[in-house]
Regions:
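The conserved glycine-aromatic submotif of the RRM
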Residues: 52-54
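P-loop NTP-binding module
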Residues: 1-50, 60-295
Length: 295
């Protein structure tokens, strides 16, 4: 919640803001109501006296928590993330709620590899696949979408699991028209939902669960094609159902050109993964790499 206008606070915000017009840390904390004008003055005094950074001084005085500092820094560096419970997204979205943890560091490393090996090579779409239910494909797709959006890439996450969709739950989007409705010609591009908490992220939910998902995904005469999305987004990630349960993941990967396979430690059989790779190759798609889910 923003602070009510106060001349002293306004003066401090001016003092705390750099000349290039970008609000600095102190101004952001004032604007967010985490600091009062009097508190900011105390911070400035301690900062000068002990040669501290503004955030360090504010924490030392007990005026803000470390979480408040991290939130302000995320705004200052255009790196959005959420406080626990904010936006009511699923707790599995660790990239949104725990952006500085070890899991998210690994996600960022994976993002870098995908940028180098796939997206900078002219590709825009990638299928996220798994062998078994519970291997973590939906988890990986959702969190990768968040970290790509944090990089500034215009990112679209498509829930192409038309059997047991999860992304509408993870992003708290409810049951709304989605991919299945678009493929059936009952919805258009307006079914794509922007996620306000992440400026560069949009989600297309699965929509109504159809009785014939494989046939719907395979239709050559579909009114909507991936090329239509590629005009508006830099990165398109497609979540798919387990390959052991259906051929849907291979069908989707054939359209996207490549797949990233999620393997669950002590759970996924290597023979099944090899069979999936063979099916991909037969469909003209590439296996870009594998990710071992240890959680």
């Amino acid at each position: 919640m923003n602070m009510p206008y106060h001349p002293a606070a306004a003066k401090l915000i001016d003092e705390l803001s750099p000349s290039n017009g970008e609000q600095n840390l102190g101004g952001l904390l004032l604007d967010a109501g985490k600091l009062t004008a009097a508190g900011a003055e105390r911070v400035l005094q301690l900062q000068k006296a002990e040669n501290l950074r503004f955030g360090e001084a504010a924490i030392k005085l007990g005026l803000i928590a470390e979480a408040d500092l991290c939130q302000a820094l995320s705004q200052q560096f255009s790196y959005p993330y959420l406080s626990p419970g904010e936006n009511h997204f699923g707790p599995e979205l660790v990239a949104a709620y725990q952006p500085f943890g070890p899991q998210v560091e690994r996600l960022r490393a994976l993002r870098s590899q995908l940028m180098l090996r796939w997206f900078t090579a002219g590709h825009k779409t990638l299928t996220i696949a798994s062998i078994n239910l519970g291997d973590g494909a939906s988890y990986l797709a959702a969190n990768l979408a968040v970290v790509f959006s944090q990089l500034g890439e215009r990112t679209l996450l498509i829930d192409a699991d038309l059997r047991q969709p999860r992304q509408h739950v993870l992003f708290n989007l409810g049951n709304r028209p989605g991919l299945s409705d678009m493929l059936a010609g009952r919805a258009g591009m307006s079914a794509v939902t922007r996620i306000p908490a992440f400026l560069n992220l949009s989600v297309l939910t699965a929509g109504a669960v159809p009785p014939n998902p494989s046939e719907l995904l395979s239709r050559a005469t579909s009114p909507i094609k991936l090329e239509d999305f590629a005009q508006h987004y830099d990165v398109i990630l497609m979540d798919t159902p387990p390959a052991r349960a259906s051929a849907d993941a291979v069908i989707v990967a054939a359209r996207s050109g490549g797949a990233l396979l999620v393997l669950r430690q002590n759970h996924t059989q290597l023979a099944a993964a090899a069979a999936f790779q063979a099916n991909l190759s037969g469909a003209g798609a590439a296996l870009i790499g594998t990710v071992l889910n240890q959680f």
